[in-house]
From Swiss-Prot:
One of its GO terms (biological process) is L-arginine biosynthetic process. Belongs to the lyase 1 family. Argininosuccinate lyase subfamily. It comes from Synechococcus sp. (strain JA-3-3Ab) (Cyanobacteria bacterium Yellowstone A-Prime). Transmembrane segments: none annotated. SUPFAM superfamilies: L-aspartase-like. Residues 462-489 are annotated as: Disordered. This is Argininosuccinate lyase.
Length: 489
């Protein structure tokens, strides 16, 4: 019988195995190619962990200090961009450990005392996502600011409002822009709620059942800036709800950016002509020399699908997993990283485009309002104010519009005698009532498009914007004994 051969490359679990892992299986199994992005967070988590091990007497002060110095050297290498993971390391955790052992010797192998890669990666992911949420919220804040600046310039610019992509009623352009600011404000708030769910420390949960060593999880959570510690070790290592919530929040951000992109694409067509693209944010055709294409907007619209896909992929991955950790969860990272990158890129591109890439064609917008029947509702409202039931008024105005369409004229072209032939309630003041600018100004109900109401809404939005200006992130709490952080409730 052949004698078993020892593994050629020691792995963090190789003691159980007599033979070597097939090299292609090793490559298939490895995640170092993408989870290296978690490197600074893995080092930060390890620094907090070793400080706790020393404070609890699980490691001697000398051992903890040696490991700390080694980790700080790795941290420096990461910051300088010179850290090179061992090519044999299967993941970011083992890459850090192998470098640590190379720096400080065998004592480095004590770093993993009292933890598992299961709670380690869960901690890394939460630290990473917490930072990225802050970055995305900052980008949302900046885009909201651009929308508010544009809205402040166009309170009294009017254009057709649409339902079913058919002209419906005239509105203020600022009102339209503020609608998108409202969407992004909700996105900003939503990500704040997701951050609260992310800000829970799972470190110390072990592989699934905790540890018999006298660790201090509250100290680790305090050092890493977490609000609380997880309550159940099984749940802590297998929970990816917060990733689903982030993907869902990211998907809604892209829904809103995609809707805005679609409208601007339409507005930039010759058929609409409401927007002109500047050279800074448009591209051309390799064949047709006259073209000026809205590629930035089309890419934002197109990238939305991949973000939706990552949400669906994660849900499908999670739906059949028994407790606790399963290797399937390795698949949670690439989609997350891509979603983070995509959302940030789209927010940046849209901010630049709205600031530098479009010019509103206000004369064309206002001319369009003069060319349609979007003031028909105001004729019905006029009759209602004269005491005529709305349904009767609605029916009558429909007949008037039908007559005008048949004759190729607009409501403003009807002389007063023709108005009176439809109903004796019409007087000279009907012409003021159907003037598009007056139509918009009259919409004074709360949340409406009336100029006065829009100015008030803009002031509220600007005040809200200033109140939510992102502050510089505070440093992590100083080293201290356990702070009595509560369990997750």
């Amino acid at each position: 019988m052949a004698k078993p051969t020892a593994p050629s490359t020691p792995r963090p679990w190789s003691g159980r195995f007599a033979g070597s892992l097939h090299p292609r299986i090793a490559r298939f199994n490895a995640s170092i190619g993408f989870d290296i992005r978690l490197l600074p967070y893995d080092v930060a988590g390890s620094l907090a962990h070793v400080q706790m091990l020393g404070a609890c007497g699980i490691l001697s002060r000398e051992e903890a200090e040696q490991i700390r110095q080694g980790l700080e050297q790795i941290e420096k290498e990461v910051a300088e961009g010179i850290f090179q993971p061992d090519p044999e390391a299967e993941d970011v955790h083992y890459a850090v450990e192998r470098r640590l052992v190379a720096l400080v010797g065998e004592v480095g192998k004590k770093l993993h005392t009292g933890r598992s890669r299961n709670d380690q990666v869960a901690t890394d992911l939460r630290l990473y996502l917490r930072d990225e949420i802050d970055t995305i919220r900052q980008a949302l804040w900046e885009l909201r600011g651009v929308l508010l600046d544009l809205a402040s310039q166009h309170v009294e610019t009017i254009l057709p409002g649409y339902t079913h992509l058919q002209r419906a009623q005239p509105i203020s352009l600022a009102h339209h822009l503020l609608a998108y600011e409202e969407m992004l404000w909700r996105d900003w708030q939503r990500l704040g709620r997701v951050r609260e769910e992310v800000n829970v420390c799972p470190l110390g949960s072990g592989a699934l059942a905790g540890t018999s060593l006298p660790i201090d999880r509250q100290l680790v959570a305090h050092l890493l800036g977490f609000e609380r510690i997880s309550a159940n070790s099984l749940d802590a290592v297998s929970d990816r709800d917060y990733l689903v919530e982030f993907h869902a929040a990211a998907s809604l951000i892209l829904v809103h950016l995609s809707r805005l992109s679609e409208e601007l694409i339409l507005w930039a067509t010759q058929e609409f002509g409401f927007v002109a693209l500047t050279d800074a944010c448009a591209t051309g055709s390799s064949l047709m020399p006259q073209k000026k294409n809205p590629d930035v907007l089309e890419l934002v619209r197109g990238k939305t699908g991949r973000v939706f896909g990552h949400l669906q992929a994660l849900l499908v991955t999670l739906k059949g997993l028994p407790l606790a950790y399963n290797k399937d969860l390795q698949e949670d990272k690439e989609g997350l990283f891509d979603t983070v990158d995509t959302v940030k890129a789209c927010l940046e591109a849209m901010t630049i485009l709205l600031r530098e890439g479009i010019q509103f064609q206000t004369q064309r917008m206002e001319a369009a309002v003069q060319e349609d029947f979007s003031n028909a509702t105001d004729v019905a409202d006029y009759l209602v104010r004269k005491g005529i039931p709305f349904r009767a008024a609605h029916d009558l105005v429909g007949q008037i519009v039908r007559t005008c369409v048949a004759e190729g004229i607009l409501l403003k072209d009807l002389p007063l005698e023709r108005w009176k032939s439809f109903h004796r309630a019409f007087e000279e003041d009907i012409f003021a009532a159907i003037d598009p600018r007056q139509v918009v100004a009259a919409r004074l109900s709360a949340g409406g498009t009336g100029f006065a109401v829009v100015r008030e809404a803009l002031q509220r939005a600007q005040a809200r914007y200033q109140q939510t200006e992102p502050a510089e992130e505070p440093p992590l709490p100083p080293s201290s004994p356990g702070s009595g952080l509560p369990l997750e409730s």
